[in-house]
Amino acid sequence: MNQPVFVLNTNAKRENQKEAQQGIFLAVKSVASIIKTCLGPKAMLKMILDPMGTTVVTNDGNAILREIDVTHPAAKSMIELSRAQDENVGDGTTSVVILAAEVLASSELFIEKKIHPHYIIKAFRMALDDSLSIVDQYSVAIDLKNRPEVLKVVQSCIGTKFIGKWGSLMCNLALDAVMTVHIQEEDGRSEIDIKRYAKVEKIPGGDISDCRVIRGVMLNKDVTHPKMKRMIKNPRIVLLDCSLEYKKGESDTMVDITNEDDFSALLKIEEEYVQRICEDIIKLKPDLVFTEKGVSDLAQHFFVKKGITCLRRLKKSENNRIARISGATIVSRTDELQESDIGTGCGLFEIRKIGDEYFTFLEDCKEPKACTILLRGASKDILNEVERNLTDALNVARNIVLDPRLVPGGGAIEMALSQALSEKSKSIEGLHQLPYKALAQSLECIPKILAQNCGANTVKLLTELRAKHATNPTENYTYGVDGDNGTIVDMKQLGIWDTHSVKVQTLKTAIESACTMLRVDHIASAASKQ
């Protein structure tokens, strides 16, 4: 009579509450243990063999986690956490995973004691709100017009990276690029689109010291005809996203030719069409024509006769950047071209040969709101690592320009938060007190790992640092761990700072993700379809 009802597929793997929670704790700790040694100036490098067989050597937390293959959903969630942090603020990818794992581990004891996750989560959320207000209280404003000071901050943020030797050069490149693409709106809003308008071009060869910011656009393109000019000063630029060749039908077109005259007429129509679109361009007397589509031999012939240089098959993003630096408007139909569509903001167009390839340079722009960062290096591996570190420097510079506030680095702000929250936990009553205090203690993981990674005596160092912060919290909040030699130093004197936006985002992301994990009480893995 009573047949059993199977709600889930019988092949699906299921974990009940206790198994699921234990699995999550273990998975999260495992991910954090992989990148724990990648924190601080004495960070170790990881060598990873990716699925394509390429070896990646890096200490960038996000780059490492992106390459490793994990099966547990909680571990995947931690990797996603690092990626989200990287996309949002571009820094603190290692710290956020370590902190999330530590916060989650601090709740394990309460789960074992059968305290409901609801109480733990509420305590964590209270601690997060208090942490954010304390970080605001301890933040210091920075003057963006003081370039040496801004450079020092950017350098302190990427000093842990592989390219520490060329840190000064990378910071200058990053700051120049960010200031170039920075747009201040009339209503006070700022826009810095690094991804779209600060293009990184990597060319193997030369030395890292040859890297520079081109206040304009650089393309891996050559002119379409050997007789075209290869250098033009103050060029008049036309940008097109239409083809400069005869337009063929969208579908298969059949033409019935009965005699020779019909064929000649067909060729003549093609020639007249190409000539007409070329005349639309020529009448505006441009020096340079860029198009996203093809250019026919006949069109090249007309351009060469009039001394016009033409480049074809540009990417949409490249065309947008040229429009941004030159003031030109991208036009879809040649018969709609007007004088106002011509770009005159570029000072120099030149084709240069680097190695075996030809590159187009558009430089000396009046008001470039886009730039190209040219990276040189001995090998592709070095170039890839330099690019990863430059991306971090660009993100730090962008964060400072958008939110010019700093907090002390070297684990100082985490220790100050830990001290302040521990004190505040004494005034909290009920079941919330213990998880609140546990979160406060878990924040000490950052100075602890910094000390471990440089080979210092962790127990002694942390005890001294705790005592320093406890004696005078309002003045000693800038004391942290010097990651180079494992001593307690005033970060203000050492000039080690973190950006306010990164620190706030790290705390929010780490604690919120820990709260999300705590709410999981069941894991059901569906059977894969064979």
Curated annotation (Swiss-Prot):
Gene3D superfamilies: GroEL, GroEL-like equatorial domain, TCP-1-like chaperonin intermediate domain. GO terms for molecular function: ATP binding; ATP hydrolysis activity; ATP-dependent protein folding chaperone; unfolded protein binding. GO terms for biological process: protein folding. GO terms for cellular component: chaperonin-containing T-complex; cytoskeleton; phagocytic vesicle. PROSITE patterns: TCP1_1, TCP1_2, TCP1_3. The keyword Cytoplasm applies. Keywords: ATP-binding, Chaperone, Cytoplasm, Nucleotide-binding. It is found in: Cytoplasm. PANTHER family: CHAPERONIN (PTHR11353). Heterooligomeric complex of about 850 to 900 kDa that forms two stacked rings, 12 to 16 nm in diameter. Belongs to the TCP-1 chaperonin family. Molecular chaperone; assists the folding of proteins upon ATP hydrolysis. Known to play a role, in vitro, in the folding of actin and tubulin. This is T-complex protein 1 subunit gamma. It comes from Dictyostelium discoideum (Social amoeba).
